[in-house]
UniProtKB/Swiss-Prot annotation:
The gene is grc3. Belongs to the Clp1 family. NOL9/GRC3 subfamily. ATP binds at G335, P336, K337, A338, S339, G340, K341, S342. Polynucleotide 5'-kinase involved in rRNA processing. It holds the Pfam family CLP1_P. GO terms for biological process: cleavage in ITS2 between 5.8S rRNA and LSU-rRNA of tricistronic rRNA transcript (SSU-rRNA, 5.8S rRNA, LSU-rRNA); rRNA processing. Its main location: nucleus. Keywords: ATP-binding, Kinase, Nucleotide-binding, Nucleus, rRNA processing, Transferase. It comes from Aspergillus oryzae (strain ATCC 42149 / RIB 40) (Yellow koji mold). Residues 79-97 have a biased composition (Basic and acidic residues). GO terms for molecular function: ATP binding; polynucleotide 5'-hydroxyl-kinase activity. Residues 113-126 have a biased composition (Acidic residues). Residues 8-37 have a biased composition (Low complexity). This is Polynucleotide 5'-hydroxyl-kinase grc3. PANTHER family: CLEAVAGE/POLYADENYLATION FACTOR IA SUBUNIT CLP1P, POLYNUCLEOTIDE 5'-HYDROXYL-KINASE NOL9.
Length: 831
């Protein structure tokens, strides 16, 4: 019995030792697999050494427990020997992989060549300590709980990602100067550019963002910032096996927005790359184009995480299949958030607008493409908070903030738009559905003039819960030809109802994989701010086909002065969506906010205005005398356009004047405001209420809406109503003066440094500025910065020593979207 007990005591530790050895071998094998097949999300760098991956059994040996026989030690040693063999095999693979990776690295330019590169304004910002505190606007949030992760720490070497297949040399460079580059691209080869430029196809056929461009005298404007995947220019077919393109610098002014917001900094091309140097050899040393040729992501001087915009094979085949329907196409694109709906819709749109002549159906698009955007959070051709129907006639190449509105007859126009007042339709699903149905009716009316006009519907990522009910209802009601769902991972509780609705509507359901690797340098909220800022700073001169951006801050922009009371009253009322507010608070709610300018087309323009009571308040309504009639328009830009009266009595019955400011508060509803009927109203655009002048009873509105659009609405006897929704606060407008002042001071310091350098090289003292004058100008600029920083809701960080290091670390960080695929995940995190 004693011997048996000793055997049992000696055998007791055996299972634990076996489990430990088995776990160690599994960890080593998993590490070996991870080394041989690195994931796409990880940076491709030299694998860690053997020492860094020491297994538990490779650590310092521990003495065996008392009473453990030597036989068990021998068995463990045998397993350790097996583990060491596995380690040697792993180490051999690591060395082989490291050698292969080293051989694949391109030859780096010498430090002297890097010093010879010209510096841009953004690069000088990086060298000046004054810039570090300006990056506060893009600081990531820690511990986000709404479906997003903090930026991945990529302090190690940046992954060298291949971008262009074409390498420029003397044989494929036709001509070049400091503004233009003409190259020859062989078939199935590609070229990737960073920046913004005009593209001219001279010979052959090239594809860009889904569009096939044939030789023509037309120039295509392309915007390729680092905030999105870079467009790839690929040769589809050519003459003598190659296509010939000319790329030219363009000066649209969009790069000037970096002086107004840190979100627009470091998104365009930096220093000249090796390819740029090759094509600028005969140009001055300071020459710099608005675009740069990139072979790999390592060519970027800012060391950003750049990726090319490539399509999945399933995406390409689906786009070709859908395009063959021609004018009969009516496709709804839906799926979870961050699944690539907008990218797929943009590719399909461009492909339809530029079909290849050799298509099987011989379809030639002359009627354009209708684009029904039902995503108010991230719209393609309008600022946030709107759903709209657009009629496109030309492909578009760029992110949404490069075309925040459509007013060009050449590119396309907005047929009709409705203001939802929020970035998600879940705030008022009924109003959202009514707006979608009205826009669909407008598309059917558009078919009378353009019978071969296909339709693309972009549905938001609100696909769970109530959003799924809305999506299935739209599938059954809109008479679609196709439904595309952008996720192969389901979930089944979404795919099954969607498939049943598509089957009832006799529309095939196509399931595609979602967009891979969602690494972005700007969050969704930041991209909305960029798009909104671009919307307010963009202008379209009549004599120029492409838009221009002005760098003047909103506070210095000439506003529209609109009377809200009196004989020249220009607006019918002010509506606040959502819950009822006290009229005393209307000025605070309205001042400094973003409002929609809505044209009321019918007396019955408010939903439910005959069903429920109007506004219930504690203050008595002010009597409306002869000076507060709504018969006349405002002085600018609608002065002199008489209004008729059919709409006035119906709106006047629901207007309450605020006791102090005499603002016209329009409210219909019971507890919450009833929205305007989409069938009897349309949104003309957005405006920023810069101030409310109570003494003159006027509003100062800053808006990019053309005065002719408002004048046309008034000539048709349509009343103007300002609608205050639940959009993001215009923080970008508050801080514009501060960033503009810092940019002005930076430019002045750079000019002084340039003069000092010229003085040292030329020994001329004529251009020297007196020290007293320098001090006086510097004091004026610093005072301007101080005054610009003394505004509410903005904190200026004066001590930038630690903040600058954080900003440098953020430049090496990425935002990683964590996709949720379960019911109830329709909420988007506030980054």
């Amino acid at each position: 019995m004693k011997r048996k007990a000793e055997k049992q005591q000696a055998a007791a530790p055996a299972p634990m030792s076996a489990v430990a050895a088995r776990k160690a071998r599994q960890q080593q094998m998993q590490a070996a697999i991870a080394v041989v097949k690195p994931s796409q999300a990880e940076s491709v760098q030299e694998p860690p050494s053997k020492k860094a991956r020491r297994s538990p059994e490779q650590a310092a040996p521990t003495p065996p427990a008392s009473g453990e026989p030597q036989g068990r030690t021998t068995r463990s040693s045998k397993r350790k020997a097996e583990s060491l063999k596995v380690d040697k095999l792993i180490e051999k693979k690591e060395k082989t992989l490291s050698a292969e990776y080293t051989e694949q690295l391109p030859v780096r330019s010498s430090p002297q060549e890097q010093e010879d590169q010209s510096s841009s304004d953004e690069e000088s910002e990086e060298q000046n300590p004054i810039v570090g505190e300006n990056d506060a606007g893009i600081a990531p949030l820690r511990g986000d709980v709404d479906g997003y992760e903090s930026p991945a720490d990529t302090s190690g070497p940046i992954q060298e990602f291949p971008l262009s297949k074409t390498r420029l040399n003397k044989s494929n460079i036709i001509y070049s100067d400091e503004h233009t580059l003409c190259v020859r691209i062989k078939e199935k080869m590609s070229l990737v550019l960073l920046g913004h430029y005009d593209l001219w196809v001279k010979r052959g056929v090239v594809s860009v963002m889904g569009a096939k461009l044939h030789p023509s005298p037309r120039l295509y404007r392309v915007y390729a910032p680092s905030t999105h995947s870079l467009p790839v220019i690929k040769c589809v077919s050519g003459v003598d096996g190659a296509a010939e393109i000319e790329v030219k610098s363009c000066h649209s002014g969009i790069y000037r927005l970096r002086d107004l917001s840190p979100l627009y900094r470091r998104i365009w091309n930096g220093k000249n790359t090796s390819a740029d140097k090759l094509t600028l050899r005969t140009s001055p040393s300071s020459a710099k184009r608005t675009f740069s040729v990139l072979y790999t992501s390592a060519d970027d001087s800012f060391k950003r995480h750049l990726r090319p915009l490539h399509l999945e094979k399933q995406w390409s085949s689906a786009i070709k299949s859908l395009s063959q329907r021609g004018g009969r196409l009516k496709a709804l694109i839906c799926g979870p958030k961050a699944s690539g709906k907008s990218t797929f819709s943009r590719y399909l749109l461009n492909h339809l607008l530029s079909p290849a002549p050799q298509t099987e159906t011989n379809y030639c698009n002359t009627d354009g493409v209708a684009f029904l955007d039902l995503d108010p959070g991230q719209p393609e051709f309008s600022p946030m908070g709107q759903v709209y129907l657009a009629h496109l006639r030309s492909p578009v190449f760029g992110p949404p903030f490069s075309h925040p509105s459509l007013d060009s007859s050449q590119e396309g126009t907005i047929i009709r738009a409705h203001h939802i007042g929020a970035t998600s339709p879940k705030e008022d699903p009924d109003h959202y559905v009514l707006a979608a149905m009205d826009l669909m009716d407008r598309y059917r009316a558009l078919l009378a003039s353009y019978p071969q006009c296909p339709l693309i519907i972009n549905y938001p990522g609100w696909i769970f819960g109530l959003g799924l009910e809305v999506a299935t209802w739209l599938v059954r009601s809109l008479g679609l030809s196709d439904v595309v769902y952008m996720s192969e991972k389901g979930p089944t509780e979404v795919v099954m109802p969607l498939g049943q609705a598509a089957q009832e509507a006799m529309a095939p359901l196509t399931i595609l994989p979602s967009q891979p690797t969602d690494f972005v340098s700007r969050s969704s909220a930041q991209l909305r701010s960029m798009q909104m800022q671009s919307y307010f700073h963009m202008t379209r001169p009549t004599e120029i086909s492409n838009p221009l951006w002005l760098e003047k801050p909103i506070s210095r922009t000439r506003p529209f002065h609109v009377h809200y009371a009196g004989p020249k009253q220009g607006i019918k009322g002010v509506m606040v969506m959502g819950s009822q507010i006290d009229p005393d608070l209307l000025q605070e709610v309205l001042d400094g906010s973003i409002v929609a300018v809505v044209a009321v087309e019918s007396p019955q323009a408010i939903l439910g205005q005959n069903d429920g009571p109007g506004l219930t308040i504690n203050h008595p309504a002010q009597p409306i005398d002869a000076d507060v009639t709504m018969d006349d328009s405002t002085d600018t830009p609608m002065e002199g356009v008489p209004l008729q009266d059919p709409i006035n009595p119906f709106i006047d019955a629901n207007i309450v004047r605020t006791p102090t400011e005499n603002l016209p508060y329009l409210f219909v509803g019971s507890g919450s405001s009833n929205p305007l009927d989409p069938k009897a109203s349309r949104c003309l655009g957005l405006a920023l209420v810069r101030s409310i002048d109570v003494s003159s009873q006027r509003l100062e509105l800053v808006t990019p809406i053309a005065g002719s659009a408002i004048r046309d609405a008034l000539e048709q006897s349509h009343g103007i109503v300002l609608v205050r929704g639940q959009l993001d606060n215009p923080n970008w407008a508050i801080s514009e003066d501060y960033y503009a002042a810092r940019a002005e001071e930076r430019r002045y310091r750079e000019s002084l440094e340039k003069l000092k350098k010229n003085e040292a090289t030329t020994d001329k003292e004529d251009s020297i500025i007196e020290p007293e004058q320098q001090a006086r100008v510097s004091a004026i600029l610093r005072d301007r910065i101080r005054r610009a920083s003394n505004v509410p809701w903005m904190t200026v960080i004066e001590d930038n020593s630690g903040h600058q290091r954080e900003a440098a670390q953020r430049e090496k960080s990425l935002w990683k979207l964590r996709k949720k695929a379960y019911p109830g995940s329709d909420s988007e995190g506030d980054w």
